[in-house]
Regions:
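Beta1-alpha1 glycine-rich phosphate/pyrophosphate-binding loop at the start
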Residues: 2-73, 159-201
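FAD-site-proximal beta/loop scaffold in flavoenzymes
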Residues: 119-149, 242-306
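N-terminal Rossmann-like dinucleotide/flavin-binding domain of flavoprotein oxidoreductases
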Residues: 24-100, 202-220, 398-408
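C-terminal auxiliary extensions adjacent to catalytic cores
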Residues: 344-418
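FAD-binding beta-loop-beta segment adjacent to the flavin cofactor pocket
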Residues: 269-287, 337-356
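A conserved FAD-binding loop/helix module that cradles the flavin
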Residues: 289-339
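A Rossmann-like FAD-binding core segment of flavoenzymes
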Residues: 32, 74-83, 90, 97, ...
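FAD-binding core/adjacent interface of flavoenzyme oxidoreductases
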Residues: 2-4, 73-169, 176-182, 249
C-alpha cells in the first residue's frame, strides 16, 4: 500500500497534536507527515495572559525543529494561500504541496474593526505583542494611581468572540496585581460582557463562581451589556449607557485566520465539520480541528481532543479499522487569578448544540484554590516538554516508537481523567 501523505497546516495545539499523534500511531513508511507553518516554534497561548503583569514570554515558546527531525516529520516554513481540492494540493508561499489527507489547523484571528473605535482605542488581548503593550499602559496607570490620581480600567467582551475566559482572567489578575502594589483603592475596575451570564459557555457554576469573585473584589460588572463603540476615553454600549475609562481592554470578535475557497464555512469563515471526526462537510479528506473549525467554543483543551479524533480518523481510513463510538468531551479549564485559580470541569451535552453544558451531570463542578494554579503550571510544563520531544500530550509508551500504538485508549483517557 502506498504511503498516505498528510499535510498539516498550522503549529498550534491542534496542528501539533495531530502531527505527533499520527507519528505515534504510524511509521514513516505508512504515513508521511508534513507540517506547514509560518513559525518554527509552538507558543503556549494560554500563558500569555501573564505577560502584562511581568511574566517572561520566552518560556512560552517551544522550538520544534529538533522534535520534527527526531520524529520523522517534515516541516515547511510557509503561509497557506489556498487549496486545489480537485488536484489534492495546498498552495503555499513556498509552492504547491500534494496531500492525501489535509489537516487545516490555522486557527482564529481577531477582527477589532467590526466595532467602531476598538482598533484605535482598545487594547486587544489576541497576541503577545498586544499583551505587552497592555502591560506598558497598566504600568503607567499604576504610576498615576500611586500619585493619587484616580484611574479607571474597563474590560469589554463583544459578540462574535468564542474564547471569553482570558478576558475574565485579566480582570481578576489585575485586581490581585493592584492589591499587591497597595493601590487598588485608586483604581476602578469595570467589566461588561455581551453574554447573558459570566463565562456563559461554561454554564451556571462558573457564572456563580465569577459573580462571587467580582463582588468580593469590588469589580463593577454587567452582563448582557454589548459594546457598540469606543472613543478615546469613553465606551458606548448598545443600551445607550456610557462608561469612562483610562484603559480599555477588549477581546474583539473572531474570524478564521485563513479563508479557504471551496470549503463550506459559517459566516465567520470557520469550516463546517463532522462533530465526531472533524472532517469538513462534504470533503472527507480534509479535517479542521481546533479554532479553524466551527465548534462554537475555542479552547486549547478542546483543540487537543479534536486533534486526537482527527488522527484516529486518518489512521482508521488507512487501516480499515472501525472508529470507536464518540464520547462527549469533558472540558477542563483553569481560570488564573494570579494569587490562586478557579478550576472547572464542564461535561458537554450529547446532541443538539455541541457546546451545551450538561448541567445535571455529577461531573460538572468548579472550585477555587491556589493548588489549581500550581497544577495548571505543571500541566503547561508537561505539555511543552512533550511537544519539545515531538510527542502528543498523551500517548503512553507507544509514542516513543515510530510504529503504531498498541493501546487505543489515549483519547478517551484525555477526555475522562482530571
Amino acid at each position: 500500500m502506498a504511503r498516505t501523505e498528510v499535510v498539516v497546516l498550522g503549529s498550534g495545539f491542534a496542528g501539533l497534536e495531530t502531527a505527533f499523534r499520527l507519528r505515534a500511531r504510524a511509521s514513516e513508511d505508512d504515513v508521511g507527515v508534513t507540517v506547514v507553518s509560518e513559525r518554527d516554534d509552538f507558543l503556549f497561548r494560554p500563558g500569555t495572559v501573564r505577560l502584562p503583569f511581568g511574566a517572561a514570554e520566552e518560556p512560552l515558546h517551544v522550538p520544534l525543529h529538533r522534535a520534527f527531525r527526531r520524529r520523522g516529520i517534515a516541516t515547511v516554513i510557509a503561509t497557506a494561500e489556498g487549496i486545489d481540492l480537485d488536484r489534492g494540493q495546498v498552495h503555499t508561499s513556498r509552492g504547491p504541496m500534494a496531500y492525501d489527507r489535509l489537516v487545516v489547523a490555522t486557527g482564529a484571528a481577531s477582527r477589532p474593526e467590526e466595532i467602531p473605535g476598538v482598533a484605535e482605542h482598545a487594547h486587544s488581548i489576541a497576541t503577545p505583542g498586544a499583551l505587552h503593550r497592555l502591560g506598558e499602559d497598566l504600568r503607567w496607570m499604576a504610576q498615576n494611581a500611586r500619585h493619587g490620581r484616580a484611574q479607571r480600567v474597563l474590560f469589554a467582551l463583544p459578540p462574535g468572540n468564542h474564547c471569553a475566559a482570558p478576558l475574565y482572567e485579566l480582570a481578576l489578575m489585575l485586581d490581585t496585581w493592584l492589591r499587591r502594589k497597595q493601590i487598588r483603592d485608586n483604581v476602578e475596575i469595570a467589566f461588561d460582557t455581551c453574554e447573558e451570564t459570566y463565562v456563559q459557555a461554561f454554564g451556571p457554576k462558573l457564572h456563580a463562581l465569577v459573580s462571587r469573585q467580582f463582588e468580593a473584589r469590588g469589580i463593577d460588572s454587567r452582563t448582557a451589556s454589548t459594546l457598540a463603540e469606543a472613543a478615546e476615553r469613553s465606551a458606548v454600549f448598545a443600551d445607550g449607557s456610557v462608561r469612562e475609562f483610562d484603559v480599555l481592554v477588549a477581546f474583539p470578535p473572531q474570524v478564521a485566520s485563513v479563508g479557504y475557497a471551496g470549503l463550506p464555512a459559517d459566516d465567520r469563515g470557520f469550516l463546517r465539520c463532522d462533530p465526531d471526526t472533524r472532517a469538513v462537510t462534504g470533503r472527507p479528506e480534509v479535517y479542521a480541528p481546533g479554532d479553524a473549525g466551527d465548534f462554537p467554543l475555542k479552547l486549547g483543551h478542546l483543540a487537543l481532543l479534536q486533534a486526537d479524533a482527527v488522527a484516529a480518523a486518518i489512521i482508521a481510513h488507512r487501516t480499515g479499522a472501525q472508529l470507536s463510538a464518540r464520547r462527549v468531551p469533558v472540558v477542563r479549564h483553569v481560570l488564573d487569578m494570579l494569587d490562586d485559580a478557579a478550576f472547572a470541569q464542564i461535561p458537554l451535552s450529547p446532541g443538539g448544540d455541541p457546546a451545551h453544558v450538561d448541567e445535571a451531570s455529577a461531573r460538572y463542578w468548579a472550585s477555587t484554590s491556589v493548588l489549581w494554579r500550581a497544577g495548571a503550571r505543571l500541566a503547561e510544563t508537561a505539555l511543552s516538554a512533550r511537544f519539545r520531544l515531538g510527542l502528543p500530550l498523551r500517548a503512553g509508551r507507544a509514542a516513543f516508537r515510530h510504529g503504531p500504538e498498541i493501546t487505543h485508549r489515549n483519547t478517551d483517557t484525555l477526555m475522562e481523567k482530571p
